[in-house]
A protein has these predicted regions:
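Transmembrane alpha-helices
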Residues: 180, 203-239
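Interhelical loop and adjacent transmembrane-helix boundary motif
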Residues: 81, 85, 237-283
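Transmembrane-helix boundary motif in ABC transporter permease subunits
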Residues: 101-133, 146, 154, 289, ...
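Transmembrane alpha-helical segments of polytopic membrane transport and secretion proteins
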Residues: 1-49, 293-301
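Generic hydrophobic transmembrane alpha-helix motif, especially the helices
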Residues: 134-172
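Glycine/proline-centered hinge or cleavage motifs at structural transition points of membrane proteins
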Residues: 140, 199-200, 213
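C-terminal transmembrane helix and the adjacent membrane-cytosol boundary/short C-terminal tail
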Residues: 116, 120, 182, 186, ...
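Periplasmic/extracellular loop-to-transmembrane helix junction in inner-membrane transport proteins
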Residues: 22-45, 60-101, 122, 260, ...
Length: 301
């Protein structure tokens, strides 16, 4: 009996404190209105600052890079010690190494995500795998570049090549694609699985015919975003791909991606016009992939 009385007293006192805190008196109403306006202004300023930073970066790159964009710049070859001419070989190298990296990364990441989400028994081993993936995702790209150089370039004897860069880039993208794909698979409603099991479907039939098609939109969005990030990587490619300006044909050929080309131009200061033009094209490509991912996300809903 005493416990119920104490509970009633505590509840009543809590209500009184809430009423006093939310007093509807004139002074309390003024204070609440003022605090609401202040916090609304703070939130709005934070949102505007974020947007303005992006707009400022885009405007700066466009203003400095757009005058140097031309057909010859996009489809021409760099010439001379000042890297005059175009950047076509760097575009080809970027597409080549990114495509190769995603071809390596995507199947492994999706299969691992399916295992973790659908087949693995939840326990310490699975938690350890997830922790390892999260830790791998947090490794700085320059560290991954050094690791790729030591393993693929030196130990495996692949040299500074497309395949060395693609393998290192795939390792960098693997945990990101795997974890987000796992979340996409887990987002598929359970009742869809239960309905399929109720009709006599096997585990593999449920996964291949129900779960993966239902999660395809989310998985595609994840892959597109990963491609956009891979295109913007520099440190990994700088240590594993080399700097040769040529059109790579074999995976064992070297090359120079756009990010490395931009880094060398800006770092040496030999041709800032070409650097700004390269930055503009690189930014446009990455923004295009981000917009495409956003389109896929909206289409899914």
């Amino acid at each position: 009996m005493s416990d119920s009385v104490d509970t009633t007293v505590d509840t009543t006192s809590s209500r009184e404190r809430i009423k006093r805190a939310l007093s509807h008196g004139k002074k309390g109403r003024i204070n609440k209105d003022l605090s609401n306006k202040i916090m609304l202004g703070v939130f709005r300023a934070a949102a505007y600052i974020t947007t303005l930073v992006l707009v400022a970066i885009i405007a700066y790159v466009v203003i400095n890079g757009l005058p140097h964009i031309s057909f010859d710049f996009i489809f021409g070859w760099p010439q001379g010690v000042n890297a005059e001419g175009g950047i076509w070989p760097t575009i080809v190298s970027t597409v080549y190494v990114t495509a190769l990296a995603m071809l390596i990364c995507t199947p492994i990441a999706v299969l691992a995500a399916v295992y973790l989400a659908e087949y693995a028994k939840q326990g310490k081993v699975v938690e350890l795998i997830r922790y390892a993936a999260d830790a791998l995702a947090s490794v700085p790209s320059i560290v991954m570049g050094l690791f790729g150089y030591a393993l693929f370039v030196e130990a495996m004897g692949l040299g500074l090549s497309m395949v060395s860069a693609a393998l290192a880039l795939a390792l960098l993208m693997l945990p990101i694609v795997m974890r987000t794909t796992e979340e996409a698979i887990r987002a598929v409603p359970r009742y869809i699985r239960w309905g399929a099991y109720g009709l006599g479907a096997t585990k593999w039939q449920v996964v291949s015919k129900i779960v993966l098609p239902s999660a395809f939109g989310r998985i595609a969005t994840v892959i597109v975003l990963a491609i956009g990030r891979a295109i913007g990587e520099t440190a990994v490619l700088l240590y594993t791909m080399g700097q040769a300006i040529n059109l790579p044909i074999s995976p064992l050929d070297s090359g120079r991606p756009m990010t490395v080309h931009l880094y060398l131009l800006a770092n040496d200061g030999i041709n800032m016009n070409a650097a700004y033009g390269t930055a503009l094209l690189l930014m446009a490509i990455i923004l295009a992939f981000n917009l495409f991912a956003r389109y896929l996300s909206r289409k899914r809903h």
